[in-house]
Amino acid sequence: IREPHFFHGKNAFTYFIPKTFDYFLQAKKLGMTFKAPKPDPINQNMLTGKISNKQPFIFDLCHLGQSMCKKNLGIEFAYEISNSIFGGKKDWYKDNHLFSICSKLGVDLEEMRNFTKLNEKEIIREIENNQIEQLAIGHHGVPLTVYKNNFFFGQDRFDNLIDELRKDGLKYN
């Protein structure tokens, strides 16, 4: 979405199928379920890589996620919604699924939507600033964590991030 030119020349055979297979293998290694999202949060033609101008899910999802960050529930929300999206939950975006996730986190979906709407400009500005900071560190992919000017992209480097945090005193089981 942010970098549509990234997908120029990529297609199902040269990019999407190998990436999906890699995601599946990584999930299997971690004992996690991985299934193709139904629907995918990003509306994109997997044969051509072209990103659609119509995006019914990703912006609301990102705004809700940023709102959860403001409530100190960002990681928990990301965990729950990712498991829903990539764990085979059909129609993950529908209210019954989102209500369930919010309830598990101890928040009300409607209150979060109202909070998001009231703070939309600030939330968008925060997301844009995050994108600027990602590019400044030398990466634009997601999920991405930056710690001490080093980026940790995707699930493959999560253990490296935890090791760095532990060196600095993080207590983590």
Annotate each language-model stretch with its function:
Residues 76-173:
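C-terminal cap of thioredoxin/glutaredoxin-like
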Residues 1-85, 172:
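Structural alpha/beta surface segment adjacent to cysteine/selenocysteine redox centers
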